[in-house]
């Protein structure tokens, strides 16, 4: 039995909107869906006329719908944006290689330039190779930390004003819930922000912040948008999976709970005595970090030294690992030598900047001289840095103990913000999906 | 009496991965009383269709598709391209040549 469209347009309704409960026809749905995103963009002042904007594209439903909608709105409302697609190739066989094909389809369909950056080029390791080293337990930590920085680097190369990500209302509600469940007040405070990014970084914006997942999927279906849907082949995070399942169960009973949780997150006030980590620049790669050496650099050093657990476990374990490592190396000088050798090797073999060898600004890192002349002046610095770094792992991480608990295997990912965690790819698949 | 009911089932958004990657399939349902003698319904509804799918087409673990007697929250159901929430959900009575689509929202974005 046909249900008439709530808007009185005379058409039959095709879906019930979760946000309002209204029955609505296809045309009115498209209009409402796009107009609400337009409203989110203008009210949040996400863009300025003439901006270059990178859409973080995974080939999945959210980023595909985001790219499509931004193109539509850019033309309809004369945003004057220069839109492009930015994809990260983690090097996960059977997952990312397939989804990148979808991204290339997006590039052709939406006539946007596409930039693909790979972990292999940036860090010297694919996720497949990392998983071969570390096993499947903590791979989301690596993936999330590397992806976050990879997007920053890609955005810098593209010289964009901001990065638009496909996080939807369900994702954000889930993150609020997760941060409550973990007692993670620092992230709780940040995770509902529509624009994130501190000084010196390229801001991330979330135009789909108030858009329900159901509507994104229905929109893609009715518009016949091609997207890629599969699960990440690596182990998902069980805790997040439970949070997601809980949220979906509650949403079924009362769909407005998604908006209500976001609202709660937005309006919750944080007691002043809760100390929030301050942002600074990583002494090695110069990207924003809350530590002297950023997580990506620590993880990478672990990988390159054959200590893949470095930076994952508790600080006491990190210290133990490093002590063992140093014993193996006989003394610190050997370790320093080792680091120098690494740098020299890097100079010869790679044109692409690698964290292990860098102490220079990303901005300088575009020419063929990237990791050559810039590295020279940093080799000597690294000697003292290494000492600092080694001390640091055992000392400063004390403030981090809570976040470093082993069972919260992706807790480190969101150290700075929620943007580039596996929650936008594999993390959400927690209950086996 | 012994007439079968023909409907088309479709799977998308990753739900096809639970059904051996089958994206669409025409199925012939036997009279309801031969499939489920104890059923309280006279005619096939979506509720019985889910049971039939579980018994006949589902290859992955059941809990990835079903929860209690319905689909797992996060799987959308379209009846002839329309949201099943407009059509009584589980109580929708199947008609000849209906197209029933299951779309997962739970796969990566
Ligand atoms: Zn209408
Ligand atoms: Zn760094």
UniProtKB/Swiss-Prot annotation, chain B:
Gene3D superfamilies: 3.10.20.30
Biological pathway: tRNA modification; 5-methoxycarbonylmethyl-2-thiouridine-tRNA biosynthesis
A GO CC term attached to the entry: cytosol
S-S bridge residues: none
PTM field: C-terminal thiocarboxylation occurs in 2 steps, it is first acyl-adenylated (-COAMP) via the hesA/moeB/thiF part of the MOCS3 homolog, then thiocarboxylated (-COSH) via the rhodanese domain of the MOCS3 homolog.
Pfam families: Urm1
Keyword Cytoplasm belongs to the record: yes
Keywords: Cytoplasm, Isopeptide bond, tRNA processing, Ubl conjugation pathway
Per UniProt, location of the Glycyl lysine isopeptide (Gly-Lys) (interchain with K-? in acceptor proteins) cross-link in this chain: 109
Lineage top rank: taxon: Eukaryota
InterPro entries, A to Z: Beta-grasp_dom_sf, Mopterin_synth/thiamin_S_b, Urm1
GO biological process, one term: protein urmylation
Functional note: Acts as a sulfur carrier required for 2-thiolation of mcm(5)S(2)U at tRNA wobble positions of cytosolic tRNA(Lys), tRNA(Glu) and tRNA(Gln). Serves as sulfur donor in tRNA 2-thiolation reaction by being thiocarboxylated (-COSH) at its C-terminus by MOCS3. The sulfur is then transferred to tRNA to form 2-thiolation of mcm(5)S(2)U. Also acts as a ubiquitin-like protein (UBL) that is covalently conjugated via an isopeptide bond to lysine residues of target proteins.
Protein name from the UniProt record: Ubiquitin-related modifier 1 homolog
């Amino acid at each position: 039995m046909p249900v008439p469209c709530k808007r009185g347009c005379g058409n039959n309704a095709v879906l019930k909107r979760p946000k309002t409960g209204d029955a609505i026809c296809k045309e009115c749905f498209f209009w409402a869906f796009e107009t609400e995103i337009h409203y989110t963009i203008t009210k949040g002042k996400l863009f300025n006329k003439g901006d270059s904007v990178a859409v973080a594209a995974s080939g999945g439903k959210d980023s595909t719908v985001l790219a499509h909608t931004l193109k539509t709105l850019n033309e309809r409302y004369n945003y004057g944006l220069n839109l492009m697609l930015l994809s990260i190739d983690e090097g996960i066989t059977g997952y990312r290689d397939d989804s990148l094909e979808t991204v290339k389809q997006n590039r052709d369909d939406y006539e946007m330039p596409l930039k693909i950056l790979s972990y292999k080029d940036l860090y010297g390791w694919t996720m497949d190779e990392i998983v071969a080293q570390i096993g499947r337990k903590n791979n989301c930590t690596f993936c999330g930390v590397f992806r976050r920085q990879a997007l920053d680097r890609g955005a810098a190369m593209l010289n964009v004003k901001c990065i638009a990500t496909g996080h939807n209302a369900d994702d954000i509600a889930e993150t609020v819930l997760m941060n409550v469940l973990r007692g993670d007040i620092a992230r709780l405070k940040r995770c509902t922000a529509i624009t994130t990014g501190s000084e010196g970084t390229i801001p991330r914006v979330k135009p789909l912040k108030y858009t329900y997942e159901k509507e994104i999927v229905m929109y893609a279906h009715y518009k016949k948008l091609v997207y890629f849907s599969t699960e990440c082949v690596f182990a998902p995070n069980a805790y997040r999976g439970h949070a997601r399942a809980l949220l979906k169960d509650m949403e079924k009973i009362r769909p407005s709970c998604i908006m209500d949780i976001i609202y709660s997150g937005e309006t919750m006030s944080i007691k002043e005595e809760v100390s929030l980590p301050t942002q600074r620049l990583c002494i090695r790669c110069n990207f924003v970090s809350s530590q002297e050496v950023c997580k990506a650099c620590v993880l990478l050093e672990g990988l390159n030294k054959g200590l893949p657990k470095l930076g994952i476990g508790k600080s006491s374990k990190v210290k133990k690992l490093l002590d063992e490592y140093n014993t193996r190396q006989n003394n610190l000088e050997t370790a320093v030598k080792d680091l120098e050798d690494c740098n020299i090797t890097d100079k010869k073999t790679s044109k692409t900047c690698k964290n292990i060898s860098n102490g220079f600004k990303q901005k300088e890192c575009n020419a063929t001289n990237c990791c050559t002349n810039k590295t020279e002046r940093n080799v000597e610095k690294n000697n003292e840095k290494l000492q600092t770094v080694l001390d640091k792992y055992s000392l400063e991480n004390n403030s981090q103990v809570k976040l470093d608990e082993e069972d919260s295997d992706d807790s480190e990912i969101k150290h700075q913000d929620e943007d580039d965690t596996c929650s936008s790819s594999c993390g959400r698949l927690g209950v086996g999906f | 009496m012994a007439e079968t009911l023909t409907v088309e089932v479709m799977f998308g958004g990753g739900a096809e991965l639970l059904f051996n990657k089958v994206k669409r399939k025409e199925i012939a349902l036997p009279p309801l009383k031969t499939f489920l003698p104890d059923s309280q319904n006279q005619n096939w509804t979506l509720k019985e269709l889910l049971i039939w799918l579980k018994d006949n087409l589902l290859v992955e673990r059941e809990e990835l598709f079903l929860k209690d007697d319905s689909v797992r929250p996060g799987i959308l159901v379209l009846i002839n391209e329309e949201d099943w929430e407009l059509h009584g959900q589980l109580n929708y009575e199947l008609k000849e040549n209906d197209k029933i689509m299951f779309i997962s929202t739970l796969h990566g974005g």
